[in-house]
């Protein structure tokens, strides 16, 4: 396994080796544009397109991305990261080809079946099927995304796995008619044009044909010859084509085949057994999930909702204990929020656990379906802040900016496990509207006891300090360390760690106003940040936040580059005071 020493998504890529090879043998990249949905399946594609030597740097600092990046290779036709976007992008590319007079080449969208739970996929299919473009949609069906696929579409696609007899029988009938003298071709064409003579004997038309696609499949995704034949047939059709490919996720590597979900985003592992090199202890996600279980025992109206991230968000514990109150809605964040609003309208308390970067998709629903109606719901914003290896598309740096624009929103940002438990209870018990609890990826690495079960913030004052440092969340630990570094440099600073970060706390404003200078360090996007809001009230506040997209790399390295390590924050404070 190339990359077993790195953190990669082996299952998706082992299942698509033959498919990727067939695509590159049949089509001419980059003239033909290959658009990978999400990009988890694209590692073989990266290797085949000249990045084998660099593959050992995958998802590492200054290495190649774990997703498709047009600025990395001309063979990466479109950026990837979030699910269900490929058909829309490929249709745009195919339309541009048509407008440019290119009637020869194709735009190929490669979609995993996990994306079949996402609404944007169907918006794209609905538009693409009736278009007069050279678009080919390849569905890689393996019955497994990150968690088990859910919903009616998963059942529909599963049922189609068993209906390969349709394509075989149709082919035999057409070959027989070809050999029939005189009337063979006319009869064959009549059968094709009406669709009913053959199909109704064996299989009703697929939904993809009803949308306007020429349907090919199901094809054995591990039979290279069959794949190439199917793709050559798709290439020859002068209309939108849907190719249905069946694969086994983790094909050829027994530990990956046997353990669904466990090889998604897996860390480095022992190649013979598949066992991880490091056994992770509790994380913010698992603590949230376990605490929610305890709360669910007492509150029978508490429900947990995920968008296909049961394991990643720690909700597997709640799902096991309260299956009737656990809901996995698939990769459908927009639907998830409105679904939660419906639960809330009937006096249930929904807790939607979602990664920060995926919550971006739900902005309209947060306002229109939840906030306007005054719904009491809890949003557990996992992976808030820098997440590291997944890069620009997954860094959780925008949630503060858009959540603070929603009226009556409350936002908590705990810095340790105790605060997380406390904030979760507060959010569930506060029935005045939407409460968001945001926390970082990984473990609690606090070195200081900075929790206060009563106050909405923690304030540490030393005599003679005229400078105040402010932060919240994960940065609190390093900022307390920076205070010690500065003390050794004979620089006295006070500190406030916010826990309830929004709405703005008037007590905190009063405290800030008493200092000569306030330096606010924030692991969030600059525009719309909490520091920006305090700076608009207190002219003595200097902001140090993130101003742009953040590439992939290790969290500690990225935080240091952004100026958020203890040493860098201490240097910033010292430099700021010298310039004053």
Task: List the predicted regions and their residue ranges.
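Short, small-residue-biased leader/transition segments that mark boundaries at the very start
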Residues: 1-8
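Cofactor-binding active-site loop characterized by glycine-rich and histidine/acidic residues
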Residues: 9-131, 301-302, 306-307, 315-316
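Non-catalytic terminal/interface segments that mediate subunit docking, oligomerization
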Residues: 33, 247-359, 365-375, 471-473, ...
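Long, well-ordered, tryptophan-enriched scaffold segments
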Residues: 143-288
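Structural signature of the thiamine diphosphate
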Residues: 187-255, 376-381, 400-450, 517, ...
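Glycine-/acidic-rich phosphate or pyrophosphate-binding loops and their flanking alpha/beta elements
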Residues: 229-232, 264-265, 283-298, 314-320, ...
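Peripheral docking tails and interdomain loops at the edges
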Residues: 268-271, 276-280, 388-390, 409-410, ...
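Generic long, charged, amphipathic alpha-helical segments
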Residues: 328, 480-484, 491-511
């Amino acid at each position: 396994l190339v990359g077993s020493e790195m953190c990669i998504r082996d299952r998706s890529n082992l299942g698509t080796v033959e498919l990727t090879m067939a695509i590159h043998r049949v089509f001419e990249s980059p003239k033909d544009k290959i658009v990978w949905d999400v990009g988890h399946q694209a590692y073989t594609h990266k290797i085949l397109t000249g990045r084998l030597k660099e593959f050992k740097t995958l998802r590492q600092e200054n290495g190649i991305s774990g997703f498709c990046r047009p600025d990395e290779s001309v063979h990466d036709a479109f950026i990837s990261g979030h699910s269900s976007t490929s058909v829309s992008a490929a249709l745009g590319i195919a339309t541009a080809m048509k407008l440019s007079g290119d009637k020869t080449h194709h735009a190929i969208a490669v979609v995993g079946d996990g994306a079949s739970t996402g609404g944007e996929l169907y918006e794209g299919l609905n538009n693409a099927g009736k278009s007069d473009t050279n678009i080919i949609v390849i569905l890689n069906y393996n019955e497994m995304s990150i968690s088990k696929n859910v919903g009616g579409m998963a059942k529909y696609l599963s049922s189609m796995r068993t209906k390969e007899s349709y394509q075989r029988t149709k082919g035999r009938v057409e070959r027989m008619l070809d050999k029939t003298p005189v009337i063979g071709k006319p009869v064959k064409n009549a059968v094709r044009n009406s669709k009913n003579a053959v199909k109704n004997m064996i299989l009703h038309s697929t939904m993809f044909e009803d949308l306007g696609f020429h349907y090919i499949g199901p094809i054995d995704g591990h039979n290279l010859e069959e794949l190439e034949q199917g793709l050559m047939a798709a290439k020859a059709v002068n209309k939108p084509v849907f190719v249905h490919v069946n694969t086994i996720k983790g094909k050829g590597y027994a530990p990956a085949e046997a353990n669904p979900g466990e090889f998604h985003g897996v860390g480095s592992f022992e190649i013979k057994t598949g066992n991880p090199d490091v056994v992770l202890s509790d994380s913010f996600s698992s603590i949230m999930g376990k605490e929610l279980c305890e709360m669910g025992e007492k509150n029978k109206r508490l429900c947990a909702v995920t968008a296909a991230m049961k394991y990643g968000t720690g909700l597997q514990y709640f799902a096991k204990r309260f299956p009737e109150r656990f809901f996995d809605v698939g990769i459908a964040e927009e639907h998830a929020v409105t679904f939660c609003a419906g639960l809330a309208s009937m006096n249930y308390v929904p807790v939607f656990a979602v990664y920060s970067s995926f919550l971006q998709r739900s902005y309209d629903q947060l306002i229109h379906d939840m906030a306007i109606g005054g719904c009491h719901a809890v949003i557990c914003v996992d992976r808030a802040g820098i997440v590291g290896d997944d890069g620009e598309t997954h860094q959780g740096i925008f949630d503060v900016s858009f959540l603070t624009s929603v009226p009556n929103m409350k936002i908590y940002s705990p810095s340790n496990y105790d605060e997380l438990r406390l904030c979760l209870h507060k959010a569930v018990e506060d029935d005045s509207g939407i409460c968001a609890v945001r926390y970082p990826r990984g473990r609690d690495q606090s070195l200081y006891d900075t929790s206060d079960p009563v106050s909405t913030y923690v304030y540490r004052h030393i005599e003679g300090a005229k400078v105040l440092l402010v932060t919240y969340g994960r940065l609190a630990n390093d900022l307390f360390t920076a205070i010690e570094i500065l003390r050794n440099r004979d620089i006295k600073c006070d500190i406030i760690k916010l826990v309830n970060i929004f709405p703005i706390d008037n007590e905190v404003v009063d405290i800030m106003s008493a200092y000569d200078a306030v330096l606010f360090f924030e692991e969030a996007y600059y525009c719309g940040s909490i520091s920006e809001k305090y700076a608009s009230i207190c002219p003595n506040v200097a902001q140090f936040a993130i101003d742009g997209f953040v590439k992939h790399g290790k969290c500690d390295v990225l935080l240091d580059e952004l100026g958020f390590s203890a040493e860098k924050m201490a240097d910033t404070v010292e430099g700021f005071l010298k310039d004053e």
